[in-house]
Design a protein with these regions (language model features):
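Membrane-anchoring hydrophobic helices of lipid-metabolizing enzymes
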Residues: 1-69, 83
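Catalytic core of membrane glycerolipid acyltransferases/transacylases, capturing the structured
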Residues: 18-23, 36, 65-123
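Short acidic-hydrophobic, aromatic-tinged amphipathic segments that line or gate anion-handling sites
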Residues: 57, 116-120, 209
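A generic structural signal for well-ordered alpha-helical segments
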Residues: 47-48, 110, 136, 170
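Positions that flank functional sites
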Residues: 63, 125, 185
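Soluble or luminal CAZymes and related metallo-dependent hydrolases
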Residues: 35-39, 76, 125, 216, ...
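Non-catalytic C-terminal accessory region of glycerolipid acyltransferases
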Residues: 130-246
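Structural motif
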Residues: 123-131
Length: 246
């Protein structure tokens, strides 16, 4: 949290960017998806520079070249989605816990990419969001989903259990599933320190529909979970090349 406060105070002279983000988000008819996404990434770059944050991405070449897909990542903290967007050149959106999505800056980041807010305690609403994601992925949209449903504030690269229901949107869309392993992202805002921090994002080999069409959502969830856990372990051991191959 110290770094978050430091970033905010260090960018007070850019406070005008917050209402600007809100304006762009409210007028998608004027500002293209690409424009709004790049403005989000511009804000992320400013935050990284002030916050002394470096994010290295591996396996970017694994991302499908055409059409929509869903990235499923482990969840460590507030920086996770920003770390992915920082290295993901094509516009993508996010499905996020509604309760965490209205914090200052978080709201603006989510709105700019037309993110989906999911109520974890409302099954009917959650099912509706998954259906929306499915339809939009069919149209070529790309989404980030954190299938653990949330995160705990604790120091370490923990990978919390995944909720199989989170995979149903990708399954219905018959879309590629891209496992994403996030490493050391928790250090950005959970460490009470301003020392330079380096995080990693690993894009693993995607699972295409033909590979998982005969699998249940539970089995898909377990497989993605195991692959991400293996990648995180390799990364902690410093073997980044092996991590991408998981």
């Amino acid at each position: 949290m110290l770094r978050f406060i430091y970033v905010i105070l260090g960018n007070l002279h850019r406070i005008w960017m917050i209402p600007t983000m809100g304006y762009y988000a409210r007028h998608p008819e004027k500002y293209s998806e690409k424009f709004r996404y790049e403005y989000d990434r511009h804000c992320i770059t400013i935050m990284k520079k002030r916050g002394r944050i470096t994010t290295n991405a591996y396996g970017v070449g694994n991302l499908p070249k055409d059409g929509g897909y869903v990235m499923f990542a482990n969840h460590q903290g507030k920086y996770d989605a920003l770390g992915i967007m920082d290295s993901h050149n094509n516009p993508c959106s996010i499905v996020m816990d509604a309760d965490r999505s209205y914090m200052p800056l978080v709201k603006q980041f989510i709105d700019l990419v037309q993110g989906k807010r999911i109520k974890l305690d409302d099954l009917r609403q959650a099912a509706g969001i998954i259906s929306e994601v499915s339809e939009e992925v069919k149209q070529g949209w790309k989404f980030i989903i954190f299938p653990s449903g949330g995160y705990e504030h604790r120091n370490g690269n923990y990978v919390d259990p995944f909720k199989p229901g989170c995979f149903k949107g990708a399954i219905r869309a018959k879309a590629p599933i891209v496992p994403v392993a996030i490493v050391n992202s928790w250090k950005v805002f959970d460490l009470w320190s301003l020392r330079r921090v380096v995080t990693q994002v690993f894009y693993l080999k995607p699972m295409f529909y033909d590979e998982y069409k005969d699998m249940k959502s539970n089995a898909i969830s377990d497989l993605v979970y195991k692959r991400i856990c293996s990648a995180v372990r390799c990364a902690e051991e410093g073997d980044f090349k092996a991590a991408v191959l998981k």
